Amino acid sequence: MRPSNFIFKEGRLFLENISVEKIAQEIPTPFYLYSEASLEASCKAYTSNMDSSDLVCYSVKANNNLNILKTFVSQGLGFDVVSGGELQKVIKAGADPKKIVFSGVGKTTSELKLASDLEIYSINVESAFELKNIINLETKPRISFRINPDMEGDTHPYIETGKADCKFGMSEKDA
């Protein structure tokens, strides 16, 4: 579906009544072009029927453009980060630490400390080793466990995330 802020007039593409051709003459190509109004409208459409206590988190690995992150902050979204760099970037964008979830394997001790010091919403624990590192922190962060259900999915083997030998999550027994 094409967002309504992108329209064709006389065979030319416009974004919010600005000629994309004119933009391409002013900045080097190729480039990415986003509509802030479309992003805001999408956020509102997605969250409009949710309870105010629901936390919608944008996955920063999808696109970590600072201006896009700032737009999502302005819309009240939270963030799912998978590295210390992403965590620092959403903080720079103005994110509320209480709306940040830190997921992903291989979190370093310094990344865990930063997340704990910022008092983020939650750190998703992916392994017993990671849990030991969290226990050794001076501050005690809020945590959740990513449980690997040991289930096969109808998908390509390279992108399966629920089998016992998957690097993501931990067994229910280990948790």
Can you annotate each of these PLM segments?
Residues 1-123, 128-141:
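A charged N-terminal "starter" segment
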